[in-house]
Amino acid sequence: MSDQVRIIEMGPRDGLQNEKTPVSVDARVAFIESLLAAGLHTVEVGAFVSPKAIPQMANSDEVLRRVNQIGGGEFHVLVPNEKGYEAARAAGAKVIAVFGSASEGFSLRTIRCV
């Protein structure tokens, strides 16, 4: 067993994607800056998904570019498919989480990658 624990803060992605209204890029970047100031240095900053499906994650490319310029942390993003992966890479993502599903129905509805 390891003597270390690694905390990855997911609030800027998982928390904000469930808000009823989209949060501005400025507010998202400020949120991430406050997490860095609090000592959380590994942060999932957004998801490269369709803004029609999850409007709260629109402009994740701009959020990532801005926090990469600020620095001070390791910034992760989430992608559901190859299109999201390519967009994340183009935006400068260094750590990309890819989510998938064993359920064909879920994949068709949510990930659109079957």
Residue ranges and their predicted role:
Residues 8-29, 72-82, 107-114:
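Active-site mouth loops of central-metabolism enzymes
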Residues 80-92:
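Catalytic cores of alpha/beta
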Residues 2-9, 28-46, 52-58:
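N-terminal glycine-rich anion-binding loops that anchor highly charged ligand groups
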Residues 15, 35, 88, 96:
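Conserved, mostly hydrophobic/aromatic
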Residues 41-66, 100-113:
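Glycine-rich, proline-tolerant flexible connector loops at the mouths of alpha/beta enzymes
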Residues 32-33, 60-64, 85:
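Generic structural signal for well-ordered alpha-helices
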Residues 8-9, 94-103:
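Non-cysteine beta-strand/loop elements that form the S-adenosyl-L-methionine
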Residues 2-6, 39-41, 69-75, 92-94:
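Short, well-ordered coil/turn segments that N-cap beta-strands
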